[in-house]
Each structure stands twice: as C-alpha cells, then as structure tokens.
From Swiss-Prot:
Keyword entries, A-Z: Calcium, Lipoprotein, Metal-binding, Myristate, Palmitate, Phosphoprotein, Repeat, Sensory transduction, Vision
Binding site for Ca(2+) 3: 209, 211, 213, 215, 220
Protein name listed in UniProt: Calcium-binding protein 1
Keyword Transmembrane helix (UniProt): no
UniProt keyword annotation of Translocase present: no
Source domain of life: Eukaryota
Signal peptide from the UniProt entry: none
Post-translational modifications reported in the UniProt record: Phosphorylated. The phosphorylation regulates the activity.
Binding, Ca(2+) 1: 95, 97, 99, 101, 106
Biological process terms in GO annotation: modification of postsynaptic actin cytoskeleton; negative regulation of protein import into nucleus; visual perception
Summary of subunit composition and partner proteins: Homodimer; when bound to calcium or magnesium. Interacts (via C-terminus) with ITPR1, ITPR2 and ITPR3. This binding is calcium dependent and the interaction correlates with calcium concentration. An additional calcium-independent interaction with the N-terminus of ITPR1 results in a decreased InsP(3) binding to the receptor. Interacts with CACNA1A (via C-terminal CDB motif) in the pre- and postsynaptic membranes. Interacts with CACNA1D and CACNA1C (via C-terminal C and IQ motifs).
Outcome of gene disruption: Mice exhibit a normal retinal morphology but altered light responses of retinal ganglion cells.
Length: 227
C-alpha cells in the first residue's frame, strides 16, 4: 500500500495516526460492523478492513488490495464470466457517449477504476499502441484484449469496479452521484468513530476535486482511492 500523504492532509493524517489503532480495533471486533460513532457495514467495512491505517484513506493514498486469492489465481487460464462482467462494467463507466468506444485519454482512468494502477510509461506505451493500431479508440473487444492479461495477472491484488462503486454509494448517501462535504464528514465519522473537522473535510475535497465544483464525483473518487 502506498503511504504518501498529500501536504493539505498531513496535519489530519498525523491526528488520525494517533487514533488508528483504536479505530481499527473497533472495526475488527464489532460483529455487525458498528464503530463508536455510528453504523459501519458493507463496503465501508470492507474498506476499513483493507486499510487499517485510516489516514491512508483520507490521504488519499490507499491502494486497496484484495487478500488471500493469489494462490488460487492462474495467469494462463481464461477470463471467468464475472471477470468479463467486471471489464464490461468498467468499460461502460467510461464510454460516456455510449457509442461503444472509449478513447485512449480515458483508458488510464478506466484502468484505475478496475484497481490496476498503470505507471506513466505503461500509459504512454498503451496510448501509442492504441493510436497506431486501434485508431485512437478502443471498443470492448479491444479493451478485453488489452486488459484481460492484466486482470488475470493483477486481480489478486486489486479492488474492482464493483467494490469501488459500492463504496462510492455508501459515501453518496443521497444518491445524486456526488459526494458532498457533509456526506464525506458523515462517512469519516462512521469509519473513525469520531467527527472530522469541517476544515479538514474541505481540504480533502479540494485535494481531489478536479473540476472545482466542491464535490467528489465517481471519477474523482477513483483517483482518491488509487493515489
């Protein structure tokens, strides 16, 4: 897991480090996923268990890793139906005009949505491959050809789009497709068992709010989770 914390969040991270052990033990020992400050269940419980150091989540610097599957993965096998569906769901998320294609610019974000964290060099190589061979656009079959081997090799260490989407819905309590400051504050209260200050929440949102609207959409959430 990455442990680098962006500077606007350093002070908050320091405070959270002091309480991470207590917060994590509360999550681990609660049978129904309740923390002191409120209800914690489902995707939020999964996030908490996969990121014991809570300041990494707020960093935002946590790459969430699935545990326990590496021994069962066989890179030379075919994709399973559920893995094809995961690819399809990720592809749909970034096929914004619903024409059956995504462009090379969106491919990096799409890969991050799947939990695969490409290096800058990998993205350059993929971009060159797409522009030269695929006309700058990728249909679903091309996407499977590009991402299938990566999914087979990396899925043991990744959190997928379904888990990210489920976690996003837990934060987005009113279902409007964006996380507001109040929604993020409430999610952090549930995760940590105490209230996070308004200024700290605003700093978190400013750090990941790419379009400057003061809210976090799903694409920004994916970036937040993958830094």
């Amino acid at each position: 897991m990455g442990n680098c914390v962006k500077s606007p969040l350093r002070n908050l991270s320091r405070k959270m480090r002091q309480e991470e052990k207590t917060s994590y033990m509360a999550v681990q020992t609660s049978e129904d996923g309740l923390a002191d400050g409120g209800e914690l269940h489902g995707p939020l419980m999964m996030l908490a268990q996969n990121c014991a150091v809570m300041h990494n989540l707020l960093g935002p610097a946590c790459i969430f890793l699935r545990k326990g599957f590496a021994e069962n993965r066989q890179p030379d096998r075919s994709l399973r139906p559920e893995e094809i569906e995961e690819l399809r769901e990720a592809f749909r998320e970034f096929d914004k005009d619903k024409d059956g294609y995504i462009n090379c610019r969106d491919l990096g974000n799409c890969m991050r949505t799947m939990g695969y964290m490409p290096t800058e060099m990998e993205l350059i190589e993929l971009s060159q491959q797409i522009n030269m061979n695929l006309g700058g656009h990728v249909d679903f079959d091309d996407f499977v050809e590009l991402m299938g081997p990566k999914l087979l090799a990396e899925t043991a260490d990744m959190i997928g789009v379904k888990e990210l989407r489920d976690a996003f819905r837990e934060f987005d309590t009113n279902g409007d497709g964006e996380i507001s400051t109040s929604e993020l504050r409430e999610a952090m209260r549930k995760l940590l068992g105490h209230q996070v200050g308004h200024r700290d929440i605003e700093e978190i949102i400013r750090d990941v709010d790419l379009n400057g609207d003061g809210r976090v959409d799903f694409e920004e959430f994916v970036r937040m989770m993958s830094r």
